[in-house]
Amino acid sequence: MKRKNRIIKSFILLAASFSFGSLVQAEPLFAQVPGMVSYTFREEFKRDVPGTLDKIRALGITDMEFSNLFGQTATELRRLLDERGMVCSSFGVSYDDLLNKTDEVAKNAVVLGAKFVRVAWLPDRQPFTLAFAEKTAAEFNRIGKRLHEQGLIFCYHNHGYEFVPHGAGTLFDVLMAETNPQDVSFELDILWAHLPGANPAQLLEKYGSRFKLMHLKDLRLGVKGDFSGKTAVENDVALGTGQLDLPAILKAAKRAGVQHYYIEDESPNTATQVPQTLAYLKSLTN
């Protein structure tokens, strides 16, 4: 009888160990709900701001990065967000406005409740040279300091052309090296890092907390890279169906301390691709 009890206990312990192992394996890799970049629904926002916010809220998303006020004042947009229990954590502006309307940009960001002010495109950047990178870094430092003094964090969003080779690295490395970490942070757009040949996970490991924000995107299979900073919008595909190694990127992002993740899908297929992307993120496990 004792031997039989020992055998039963052994089976119970073995079963429990398998169950525990299954639970550990089922731990979600990406537990939070991501935010949304307004550009994903740019056409809808042009027609109906309140209705588009309702549509995004219905997906379970409450964190927004706005790249446009869509005809609203910052106060009006903040009211619409508050009514829906939503927030704007990052406010995207043009580089021209950042340079020439810095105080207005800062005021709008504060009204919106945003902590971050983001720029995603540099005008007159062709060709992207060492001299241009150094000039841009100096401007970033100056503007970043002004925003920092107003309680905001400036972030630059890479767009591909910065990864032109230079020395043992790229001109993106020059931007990192020549900017002050206390005044200039970065938003990693993983598609626009991958397309010119960089490895997003390795960038996160290398620069860590310099990356405060991330755009979650995937690139259609078969698309070849370049340094143009441009690709057809149809090349944005649902996460997990393209070229990028999302699990490796998300693990590296967690280690780096990325604070906000935003879905950005520039394609005309957001009605199907955004839900597919959300389902993919939920399916990931460690």
Which ranges hold each PLM region?
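Catalytic-core regions built around general acid/base machinery
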Residues: 76-83, 139-147, 248
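N-terminal pre-domain/capping segments
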Residues: 2, 25-116, 285-286
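Positively charged n-region of N-terminal signal peptides that target proteins for export
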Residues: 1-9
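Active-site acidic/histidine proton-transfer and metal-coordination neighborhood
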Residues: 62-63, 70, 95-185, 271
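Histidine-acidic metal/acid-base catalytic patches
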Residues: 27-35, 45-59, 113, 169-188, ...
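Bacterial N-terminal signal peptides
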Residues: 10-22
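Secondary-structure boundary/capping motif
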Residues: 84-90, 118, 146-148, 180-181, ...
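Active-site beta-loop-alpha junctions enriched in small/polar residues
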Residues: 39-41, 67-69, 93-96, 122-124, ...
